[in-house]
Amino acid sequence: MADSLDHAPAQANNLPQFLALTIGSIGVVYGDIGTSPLYAFREALRPFGPGGVGRDEVIGLVSLVLWTLTAIVTIKYVLFLLRADNDGEGGTLSLLALLLKKGTKYPVLMFFAGVLGAALFIGDAMITPALSVLSAVEGLKLVAPALHDYVLPISVVIILLLFAVQSRGTGAVSVFFGPITLVWFLVMAAAGVAHIGDDLAILSAFNPLNAIGFLWNAGLIGFIVLGAIFLTVTGAEALYADLGHFGRHSIQAAWFAVVFPALALNYLGQGALVLSHPDAISNPFFLMFPNWALLPMVILATAGTIIASQSVITGAFSLIRQAIHLGFLPRFEICYTSETQTGQIYLPLVNTILLTGVLALMLMFGSSEALAPAYGVSITGAMVIDTILAFEFVRRQWGWPALTAIAVLLPLFSLELIFLGANLFKIHHGGYVPILIAGTLIMMMWTWRKGVSLLREKTARQDVPLDQFIATVERKSEHAPVEVPGTAIFLTATPDTTPAVLLHNIKHNHVLHQHNVIMTIKTAKVPYVPEKDRYTITKLSDRFSLLELRFGFMDDQNVSRALVRCRKEGFRFEIMSTSFYLGRRKLIADPRSGLPQWQDKLFIAMADSAIDPTEYFHLPANRVVELGEQVII
């Protein structure tokens, strides 16, 4: 597996590489937003009912779609937020890590904002596969109405297969994601062009006054429709989250050259079709195609939705890994499915949770029409969070005056709040789902942070300063522990205090190794730490050294590999004659200790679900010694 230098944020050094990154970004970054035409315009028309939508309403709706894509995706994400990176990496937690590193006047507010944004993204990762796959497979009802009852079972089978192959990695098939999605966008654009001629009046949708006029005249229905309009930009947050994988210029080029034109043409074509054939309101996307093309389009749409689903699943894995490394969640098992790309990971527990959530949503709602209202809340919430974090970023990182930041971001923030309000109208129609998912994840992250903090406070009362301990054991005395040959490495989170496992080893075994290394592992608030900055070794005495290993929150925290690097550069020890001492705590709940009983039990359950440090840090299992203790929390 390559080191972190091989996984720096993507940059194109020549034209072929730039084109490869651009096509790749079309598949991974834009897969989600590319499937929105399947259902977004249909859902926007739904409040008017069959035959209840007039020409002005159709043109106004398409105008709203075009200008929402322009304001939210083009201006906010493609032109602005892609520049707000943390050493080339984007995403909510990456931006939060940068703000916490730089310092902010509102650390608690920023923490909760970042965690809420991440939690909403996990909700999105459950809803996107369910909604997009259902939307694609529902096209079968137009091919053969008798297949109506088979839509849900077929969709469930596709989802089961999709999650079943996650453990094998997607490296082998991901090379096809970009080309397949490129074909999808080109077909959508061609379909749009073919139908714009049905009624050229649709071209007046480019005039933003039509969007404003629609909202002014439609009243409450217009406000409710905004929730469906926002479905056209679902997946825009992936632009920012995938910044490190493809680079800003490739993502921007893909948007302006392919994605935006294809989406605009397709929505214009759907609008023209509805103007000329009002009965097409039931499913304007698939009704753009002749009967002979319906089955191929269902197959292509299904492939596109699988790619979109894969993108958010991969994004969820990456986000949870960031949360683990930043200390927001316990250490879950992380499997690397590629020998060359640390970004290709698989988290078994997270995969199971996502699969369970997706299947539950599909079985609970049964159709894309019923599930669509649940989608907008998570996306609008995540985008509002991005804007809040971006406001603090431009002030701290770019040095913008407060008035300048307000002038630039307030219009976007206000627009997103309006969309959020429109989506909140759908809470009783399924909008509660992402709120419940986000609330559960926030509760877990907050409980973990509080529990870890309380645990540190309790153990700190028994801590022995490391310098004091070394002075004591180095002193010649008849009670001094027996020295044994070899090297012992003791893992600790607090390098200035004596590891509890070291104290227990002396207390119970009465021995001290010839060489003792106090090792601490730090996660920097940057995505990757260069190998030259990976470690620092400090000699404390003849028998004691302090080793600090540093990893970025996107790095594979492979301690064995880092130690090999240390050995090459002068840190002398034999890995197979070295013992790694780890402490294992048995947590006992006590409602009087600082946490409510329910939170105590949740924290202990989360701690018990964490992967063994031996596996997580890639330590040689046959060289690990564990000593346990009970802690009341």
From Swiss-Prot:
Stored InterPro entries: K+_transporter, K_trans_C, K_trans_N, Kup
Gene Ontology terms, MF aspect: potassium ion transmembrane transporter activity; symporter activity
GO CC terms of this entry: plasma membrane
Membrane topology type: Multi-pass membrane protein
Membrane-spanning segments: 61-81, 107-127, 143-163, 173-193, 211-231, 255-275, 287-307, 345-365, 371-391, 402-422, 427-447
Subcellular location: Cell inner membrane
Highest taxon, organism lineage: Bacteria
Keywords, sorted A to Z: Cell inner membrane, Cell membrane, Ion transport, Membrane, Plasmid, Potassium, Potassium transport, Symport, Transmembrane, Transmembrane helix, Transport
Catalytic activity: K(+)(in) + H(+)(in) = K(+)(out) + H(+)(out)
Function: Transport of potassium into the cell. Likely operates as a K(+):H(+) symporter.
Assigned protein family: Belongs to the HAK/KUP transporter (TC 2.A.72) family.
Protein name, UniProt field: Probable potassium transport system protein Kup 3
Organism: Sinorhizobium medicae (strain WSM419) (Ensifer medicae)
Gene that produces this protein: kup3
